[in-house]
Amino acid sequence: GIVESSSNDKFKEGDNVLVTGYDVGVTHTGGFSEYAQVPGEWIVPIPQEMSIKESMVYGTAGFTAALSIFELEKYGMNIKSQPEILVSGATGGVGSVAIQILHKIGYENITAIVRKEKQIEIAKKLGAKQVIIIEDDNKPLKKGIFDYFLDTVGSNVTLYGLKRLNYQGVATVCGNVAGNSLNANILPFILRGIKLIGIDSVYVDHNIREDIWSKLANEWNIGNSLLYNEIGFEEFYKTIDQLLKGQHLGRTILKV
């Protein structure tokens, strides 16, 4: 939004700013109101290259997707080597943005996980080279296929990817829509030396926040191709219900 008034010297009236994470929507209510009062340390200036609306089309999900890619690159993922990358929840809020960013910055070997056949073509249009619908299996270890795994849904999907990582593969996990439990075994870790990294977008360092938003406004900018729809309050609860049932597609912004 736009700063109306501020007692913090870092911000002044008229500044374009955003807030994601911290206690917003948890203990600090008012996320859907026209006015909000928040601590200054929660606030991130919106980069000049990005509009207010665009920042919210990205939202927490877009920020989390970018943060996941940031972490994977920190652990060795790079365009030059063109690694095999697996992305789950490919048509959801986080997964769809992740695939588009990866495709935009030059990664070619992206495999997307979807739940339904009708999502296959959508995932391909987003930038996935291959699309799979996974099936459960009981084997503790499978043939290594992927170098990196960006998981957005958790539980059995996390397990599916971990078992298929190549030697010293790296996985990130940022969501739990498929469940909180992880019935994993240690074989992928001790036989292939894989890493599993948790992504927390709530309390991540403020300097990293600003770096991520700068990337989203510049070299990682996919604002013109983001999959989103805009709704009013009358559609709010229906949209939340679709999200909880795994029927939601892309991003949704609420017009207030």
Model-inferred region functions:
Residues 156-222:
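Glycine-rich phosphate-binding loop and adjacent beta-alpha segment
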Residues 62-63, 89-96, 100, 154-155:
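Glycine-rich NAD(P) Rossmann-fold beta1-alpha1 loop
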Residues 1-24:
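Glycine-rich beta-strand-centered segment in the early N-terminal region that forms part
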Residues 18, 147-150, 172:
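N-terminal Rossmann-like NAD(P) cofactor-binding module of classical short-chain dehydrogenase/reductase
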Residues 101-109, 167-168, 192:
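Conserved S-adenosyl-L-methionine
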Residues 87, 103-156, 214:
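Adenosine-nucleotide cofactor-binding segment
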Residues 207-256:
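C-terminal hydrophobic helical "lid"/dimerization subdomain
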Residues 20-85:
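NAD(P)H dinucleotide-binding glycine-rich loop of Rossmann-like/cofactor-binding domains
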